[in-house]
Amino acid sequence: MSALLEATGLTRRYGHVTALDDVSVHLAAGERVAVVGESGSGKSTLARLLLALDTPDAGTVALDGRPVRPGSARSTRWFRRRVQTVPQDPGRSFNPRMRVGDAVAEPLACLRVHGDHSARVAELLVAVGLEPDAARRWPHEFSGGQRQRLAIARALAPRPDVLVADEPVSALDVVVRLQVVELLAQLSAAEGLALLVVSHDLGVVQHLCDRVLVLDAGRVVEQGPVGEVFGAPAHPVTARLLDAVPTLAAVVS
């Protein structure tokens, strides 16, 4: 499969600390790829670079072969229309003074998509398992799991090709995590949406992703199909992650 979103040789340093060291990753249309690793391995740094929210010291990020770097809202608008993100903490990602319908439609306004977005908002709310009249309510009226569904709806508003999710369920309880993971899988299949999921929870990865990259100290130490990597880990970091408590696997089993 040809790459839709591709990063080549990404390196990012903060002072004397190398957070990411010559990392390459590609994502094809409709593919679901996970980036896993222990705390401080460089996962979130990679996500920020792939979202053009930070500038690498070396390497490139390209969408359909077109390079992208951080810049003004106008210069990156083409990229933002096609690549969106789901936040780690949905509670902090919504303006408490903005009704949910306006919040879900906010990316469309920011990306200069003109018109009445009420029909699109209603469609998105139904797609994530909420009622259309939720648009009139306020963020604080929803549970954590419902707010994450709203965050997913907001990310889908401009009909992106790629969704980057950095620890998308870590702030949720175990049962709600499974519900949100299943929702992401369903939406990815229905929309042909490519997913890049950053997670330390291998249960999430096993249920959602096709392929996995394992990071350690800013480098890719192992990668391949999820079943192969998790079935016979070749690196000690992967083995340690697999030995950790599998939050979702425990629920499913």
Region locations from a protein language model:
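Helix-to-loop junction immediately C-terminal to a conserved catalytic motif
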Residues: 51
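Conserved ABC transporter NBD signature motif
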Residues: 59-70
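Conserved ABC ATPase "signature" region
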Residues: 116-133, 242-243
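ABC ATPase "signature
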Residues: 223-224
